[in-house]
């Protein structure tokens, strides 16, 4: 587990460049900085893969929280916006951040006045859904919590302006609201919440959010998000409160896909994801080696299931690229063999075997779901290397039999073509 305590979190300038990423196993992903601000175009709470593992769209950017207690207002939002001249405007909610942890899921812990709040996020496995669990302990008088979801709909490497973010937007029956993008009327972005009340916002657009890494790369780095509602909650005096917030994207239909969550629904879903990562650590066999187990979890972020084959593949260039053949074969041993994911390794070899054309392994599956591109001469040679590495590590008769039946004919085809 990566764990960063409060004394290392206060510096906005340094920590906005320290980042986390988590994925959902079908090409979707989430990411941000460890202080809660977005730092790149390719970040947000839910970048959904509409045709796994490609066609990736940002649909849910982040949430901003604000606590009120008596005359005190605690703005937990951490963000950077473009200012006049060269000086950005920074909202520094990280001053209330006491802990950040990441182990396949991420958790931000805050302390403000008499209130302690944990905000825990996870992507559900093989689903374009994010779960957020809030656990709040109020040790003082009655308080209030406001959560502002920032929504979007754009290709994950693009940016949005107000004119791009036009939606049909309505409250739904599951405690949140539903968005249908004008740019994709067949899709529905659905947000649900276990409690709270919806309040329409006067200012429905968060404009000129600035991504520092994009600025460092000499682009404007500006983006706009749609925030139609605040969710508001009462935190009784001397109480503990649990809140579940979920967001998903799916084809338009008459009824919500999500049911209204219970207070602990998100926490239960997050626990399932944590159990998944625990099982990967156990399978890898590194025992109590914390560093090795961190690498096992990190390796999983690059593996995804491809719809066109129903098999596993590797997104070695995440988030920028999809399953490029050359990069996949180079990363193959570290991501699957060193982690003892032998079944996934076989599927990855078979995925690329199915796309060999005139002896060439595809070098690129385009992000828009078009036919693969064959534009590298050495990906096929790296494929031989990956097959050899697989047999050296596994070495069982059944493994040799699998390669002989499913892969060897393709190897012969490659040799003949070369």
Describe the residue ranges of each PLM region.
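Aromatic-rich carbohydrate-recognition surfaces in CAZymes
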Residues: 138, 160-162, 322, 326-328, ...
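Extended, well-ordered alpha-helical scaffold segments
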Residues: 146, 257-280, 291-298, 340-354, ...
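Structural motif
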Residues: 287-292, 323-326
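Internal amphipathic alpha-helical repeat/solenoid segments
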Residues: 309-328
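Short glycine-rich loop/turn motifs
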Residues: 105, 297-300, 315-319, 349
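Active-site-adjacent bridging/hinge elements
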Residues: 210-218, 298-312, 352-362
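Terminal accessory carbohydrate-recognition/targeting modules of carbohydrate-active enzymes
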Residues: 1-284, 319, 326, 337, ...
């Amino acid at each position: 587990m990566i764990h960063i305590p409060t004394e290392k979190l206060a510096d906005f300038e340094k920590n906005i460049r320290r980042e986390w990423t988590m994925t959902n196993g079908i090409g979707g992903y989430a990411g941000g900085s460890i202080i809660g601000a977005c730092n790149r175009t390719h970040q947000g709470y839910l970048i959904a893969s509409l045709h796994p593992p490609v066609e990736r769209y940002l649909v849910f950017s982040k949430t901003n929280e604000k606590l009120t207690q008596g005359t005190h207002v605690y703005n937990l939002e951490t963000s950077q916006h473009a200012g006049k001249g060269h000086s950005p405007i920074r909202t520094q909610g990280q001053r209330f951040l006491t802990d950040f942890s990441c182990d396949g899921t991420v958790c931000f812990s805050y302390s403000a006045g008499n209130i302690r709040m944990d905000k825990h996020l996870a992507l559900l496995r093989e689903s374009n859904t994010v779960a957020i669990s809030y656990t709040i302990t109020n040790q003082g008088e009655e308080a209030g919590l406001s959560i502002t979801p920032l929504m979007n709909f754009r290709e994950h490497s693009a940016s949005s302006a107000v004119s791009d973010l036009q939606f049909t937007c309505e409250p739904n029956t599951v405690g949140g609201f539903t968005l249908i993008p004008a740019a994709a009327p067949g899709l529905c972005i659905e947000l649900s919440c276990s409690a709270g009340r919806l309040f329409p916002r006067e200012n429905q657009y968060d404009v000129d959010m600035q991504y520092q890494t994009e600025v460092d790369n000499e682009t404007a780095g500006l983006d706009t998000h749609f925030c139609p509602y605040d969710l508001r909650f009462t935190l009784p005096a001397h109480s503990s409160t649990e809140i579940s917030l979920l967001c998903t994207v799916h084809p338009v239909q008459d009824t919500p896909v999500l049911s209204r969550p219970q207070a602990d629904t998100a926490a239960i879903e997050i626990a399932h994801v944590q159990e998944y990562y625990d099982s990967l650590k156990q399978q890898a066999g590194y025992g109590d080696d914390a560093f090795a187990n961190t690498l096992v979890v990190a390796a999983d972020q690059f593996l995804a299931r491809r719809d066109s084959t129903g098999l596993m593949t590797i997104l070695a260039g995440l988030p920028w690229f999809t399953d490029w053949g050359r990069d996949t074969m180079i990363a193959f041993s570290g991501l699957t063999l060193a982690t003892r994911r032998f079944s996934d390794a076989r599927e990855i070899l078979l995925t690329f075997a199915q796309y060999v054309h005139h002896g060439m392994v595809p070098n690129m599956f385009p992000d828009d779901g078009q036919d693969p591109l064959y534009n590298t001469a050495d990906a096929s040679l790296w494929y031989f290397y990956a097959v050899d590495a697989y047999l050296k590590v596994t070495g069982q008769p059944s493994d040799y039999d699998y390669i002989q039946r499913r892969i060897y004919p393709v190897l012969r085809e490659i040799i003949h073509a070369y």
